[in-house]
From Swiss-Prot:
This is Translation initiation factor IF-1 2. Keywords: Cytoplasm, Initiation factor, Protein biosynthesis, RNA-binding, rRNA-binding. It is found in: Cytoplasm. The gene is infA2. It comes from Burkholderia cenocepacia (strain HI2424). Pfam families: eIF-1a.
Length: 87
């Protein structure tokens, strides 16, 4: 058994907040605060308002979550392209 059971829920990013935080509305209508997982930060995955994401929520605090996947949708907004390539 895992140290802590996590709930996986889908939602849509409503707002991008300072310090890599996000406000996400879950499928059931609940609004939670979230942050990007370390794997997403390491791989420079951008999360924009309107993106569909998968969250992990702890059973102990259902107001905070960790974004661990950004779904690719045809109608989701695209990040702006910068002129310089990544190193």
């Amino acid at each position: 058994m895992a140290k802590e059971e996590l709930l996986e829920l889908d939602g849509i990013v409503d707002e991008v907040l300072p310090d890599s935080k996000y406000r996400v509305t879950l499928e059931n209508g609940v609004v939670v605060g979230a942050y990007a997982s370390g794997r997403m930060r390491k791989n420079h995955i951008r999360i924009l308002a309107g993106d569909r994401v998968t969250l992990e929520l702890s059973v102990y605090d259902l107001t905070k979550g960790r974004i661990n996947f950004r779904h690719k949708d045809a109608n989701s907004p695209r990040p702006p392209r910068s002129g310089q390539p990544r190193r």
